């Protein structure tokens, strides 16, 4: 009897051991090889799967090597920004894949397939599973949602970004841009010139714009929150770049503790501002409360709740509103600052376009304060900004995940496969833009984006489809205001000390700053 019991225990133990051995082998080997076979049978090419590492080690090595030396101003930025993608496409062709650990990441470069991926957001979603608890302290708000929760949140936030609401933010844009121009004015003698690292000041500008537009009269408090968010961003990037060890982010390390402390302080500070706003709104002064983005967001949230029969679950909670404020800081600052700095660098290299842009600003505004109607008529500056976004795409690639087995065009995509859409490759593709693709030619956008891309939908610096960046118009409006004030006061050129070294720090930034010679007009 005792022997039989021991035999049963032994058999159960062996069975469980074999089961878990199989599960582990399936996870680390059989499943990746099955996915690889499926892709190869459809004509996709890539390196053979390697246990655990995939292509990540080699990709990281290529990126580190690319960042060791700058490039010439006329050289292709892709070899510094996406050397790993260039190597994959160069070796295996456009129809290729890379390995991210045990997951294949397929390159999608066909504009029609990209439109399908970005339009069918319910099938192809963000890879949230790669985010650990610490990283999620930063990546919050609508960007972290999918499906119905995303649709509900987007409806509320869309109302806050309506162009009539954006008009209300124009004075904040002007004040922040004026402050930066005044700062430069004090550095440059009358009728003279001076070298300025404009990148540092542009970062400060876009941070101030976020603080002013988000919190209005609580601007100084907003500045403190911005500094905290900037520190949290730097720490998060450090986490993303480090080797992932399961459970490591739960450990009470100095970095983890600091990130949690920042998150707690940011939440407390934003909550205090929200409570002040809510108190004003409840006192019947809703109009005075809705003079900044936070007030507008709270107003839109209350309106949505009322429209749904005072159903509070139809709106956002205080915690969710805090998440949107954090996302606004994180996403709203980087894109505009990189757009502005590369615009100034390119206009330094092409003075004829700088002159055309300046003439347009004086023609539209003279010496008056730029207004919404005038900014909407800045055709030359719009062309220039689009061309800068094409050549120096803020985010080089987008990645989605097939959360279920699905058909993409003529291809079958198994569940779990990642789809990478390298915008920068499409934006630099001579088959789409012509042989002059790497030249700075804003005139290619003279008749709009559709005409420039031959209606192919191959220009998407702010993504495409229902999940297109909600802050696109905000960023462009801010950039036009800034360039209008800069061009009226200064001409500029590259300094001899300028070092051309674009690199990716979430967005494409100048690794060693942007040293320009400013000439006071």
From Swiss-Prot:
Induction line: By jasmonic acid (MeJA).
GO biological process: indole alkaloid metabolic process; response to jasmonic acid
Transmembrane segment boundaries: 8-28
Tissues of expression: Mostly present in actively growing aerial organs, including leaves, flower buds and stems, and, to a lower extent, in mature leaves, roots and opened flowers. Expressed in the leaf internal phloem-associated parenchyma (IPAP) inside the mesophyll.
Any Gene Ontology CC annotation: endoplasmic reticulum membrane
Pfam families in the cross-refs: p450 (PF00067)
SUPFAM superfamilies: Cytochrome P450 (SSF48264)
Reactions that this protein is recorded to catalyse: 7-deoxyloganate + reduced [NADPH--hemoprotein reductase] + O2 = loganate + oxidized [NADPH--hemoprotein reductase] + H2O + H(+)
Pathway assigned to this chain's UniProt record: Alkaloid biosynthesis
Residues that hold heme according to the record: 469
Glycan-bearing residues: 107, 311
Effect of inactivating the gene: Reduced secologanin levels but accumulation of 7-deoxyloganic acid.
Enzyme class: oxidoreductase
GO MF entry, a single one: iron ion binding
Cellular location(s): Endoplasmic reticulum membrane
Functional summary from the UniProt entry: Component of the seco-iridoid and derivatives monoterpenoid indole alkaloids (MIAs, e.g. vincristine, quinine, and strychnine) biosynthesis pathway. Catalyzes the conversion of 7-deoxyloganic acid into loganic acid. Not active on 7-deoxyloganetic acid.
Family according to the record: Belongs to the cytochrome P450 family.
Protein name per Swiss-Prot or TrEMBL: 7-deoxyloganic acid hydroxylase
Origin species: Catharanthus roseus
Gene this chain is encoded by: 7DLH
């Amino acid at each position: 009897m005792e022997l039989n019991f021991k035999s049963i225990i032994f058999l159960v133990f062996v069975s469980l051991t074999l089961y878990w051995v199989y599960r582990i082998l399936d996870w680390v080997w059989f499943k990746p090889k099955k996915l690889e076979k499926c892709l190869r049978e459809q004509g996709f090419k890539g390196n053979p799967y390697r246990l655990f590492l995939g292509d990540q080690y080699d990709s990281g090595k290529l990126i580190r090597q690319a960042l060791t030396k700058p490039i010439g101003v006329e050289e292709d930025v892709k070899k510094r920004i996406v050397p790993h993608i260039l190597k994959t496409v160069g070796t295996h062709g456009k129809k290729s894949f890379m390995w991210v650990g045990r997951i294949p990441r397929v390159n999608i470069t066909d504009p029609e397939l990209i439109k399908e991926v970005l339009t069918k957001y319910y099938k192809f979603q963000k890879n949230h599973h790669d985010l650990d608890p610490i990283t999620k302290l930063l990546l919050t708000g609508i960007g972290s949602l999918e499906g119905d929760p995303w649709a509900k949140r987007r409806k509320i936030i869309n109302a806050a970004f309506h162009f009539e609401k954006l008009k209300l933010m124009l004075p904040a844009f002007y004040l922040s841009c004026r402050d930066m121009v005044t700062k430069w004015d004090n550095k440059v003698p009358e009728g003279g010139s001076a070298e300025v690292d404009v990148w540092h000041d542009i970062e400060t500008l876009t941070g101030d714009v976020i603080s002013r537009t988000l919190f209005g009269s609580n601007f100084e408090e907003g500045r403190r929150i911005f500094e905290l968010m900037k520190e949290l961003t730097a720490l998060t990037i450090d986490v993303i770049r480090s080797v992932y060890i399961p459970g490591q982010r739960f450990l009470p390390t100095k970095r983890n503790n600091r990130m949690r402390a920042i998150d707690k302080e940011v939440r407390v500070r934003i909550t205090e501002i929200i409570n002040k706003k809510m108190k004003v709104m409840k006192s019947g002064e809703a109009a005075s409360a809705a003079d900044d983005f936070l007030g507008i967001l709270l107003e839109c949230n209350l309106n949505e709740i009322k429209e749904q029969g005072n159903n509070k679950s139809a709106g956002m909670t205080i915690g969710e509103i805090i998440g949107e404020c954090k996302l606004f800081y994180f996403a709203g600052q980087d894109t505009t600052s990189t757009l502005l700095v590369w615009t100034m660098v390119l206009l330094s290299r092409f003075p004829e376009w700088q002159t055309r842009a300046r003439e347009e600003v004086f023609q539209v505004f003279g010496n008056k304060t730029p207004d919404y109607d005038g900014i909407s008529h800045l055709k030359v500056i719009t062309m220039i900004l689009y061309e800068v976004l094409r050549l120096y795409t803020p985010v080089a690639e987008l990645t989605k995940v097939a959360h279920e087995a699905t058909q993409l065009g003529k291809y079958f995509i198994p569940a779990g496969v990642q789809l990478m859409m390298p915008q920068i490759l499409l934006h630099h593709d001579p088959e789409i833009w012509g042989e002059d693709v790497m030249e700075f030619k804003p005139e290619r956008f003279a008749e709009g984006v559709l005409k420039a891309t031959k209606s192919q939908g191959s220009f998407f610096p702010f993504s495409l489809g229902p999940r297109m960046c909600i802050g696109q118009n905000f960023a462009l409006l801010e950039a036009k205001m800034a360039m209008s004030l800069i061009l009226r006061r200064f001409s500029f050129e590259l300094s001899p000390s300028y070092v051309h070294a674009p690199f990716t720090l979430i967005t494409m930034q100048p690794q060693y700053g942007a040293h320009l010679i400013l000439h006071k007009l």
